[in-house]
Amino acid sequence: MANIKSAKKRAITSEKNRQHNASRRSMMRTYFKKVIVAIEAGDKEAAQQAFSVATPILDRYATKGLIHKNKAARHKSRIAAKIKAL
């Protein structure tokens, strides 16, 4: 554990941020799992609807730095291709 007061505060802040980011990352994954489930079921309409809900969330977290913008683009591209192939 840190001995300097500012380092102690920083450790507390870092832990809060880690938990907050973990929650957001989990939510993001959940939305994309819904899209994947719809694709695997072969339901194009449900997959498109779930994808339209998940896309802005992915973009938002890419903008905020939770994930890299290229990773967001890669996920969107791959999912869109899978939906198109249905």
Swiss-Prot record:
Q: Under the cellular component aspect of Gene Ontology, which terms does the record hold?
A: cytosol; small ribosomal subunit
GO terms for MF: small ribosomal subunit rRNA binding; structural constituent of ribosome
Positions with biased composition (Basic residues): 1-11
* Pfam families reported for this sequence: Ribosomal_S20p
Which of UniProt's keywords are assigned here? Ribonucleoprotein, Ribosomal protein, RNA-binding, rRNA-binding
Where are the annotated segments for Disordered? 1-26
InterPro entries, per database record: Ribosomal_bS20, Ribosomal_bS20_sf
**Record-level GO BP terms:** translation
SUPFAM superfamilies referenced in this protein's UniProt entry, alphabetically: Ribosomal protein S20
Query: Does the record carry Ribonucleoprotein as a key word?
Result: yes
Q: Does the keyword GTP-binding apply?
A: no
Function comment: Binds directly to 16S ribosomal RNA.
- Which PANTHER family does the entry mention? 30S RIBOSOMAL PROTEIN S20 (PTHR33398), SMALL RIBOSOMAL SUBUNIT PROTEIN BS20C (PTHR33398:SF1)
Q: Which family does the entry's similarity section mention?
A: Belongs to the bacterial ribosomal protein bS20 family.
Annotated protein name in UniProt? Small ribosomal subunit protein bS20
List the source organism.
Pseudoalteromonas translucida (strain TAC 125)
- What gene is it encoded by? rpsT
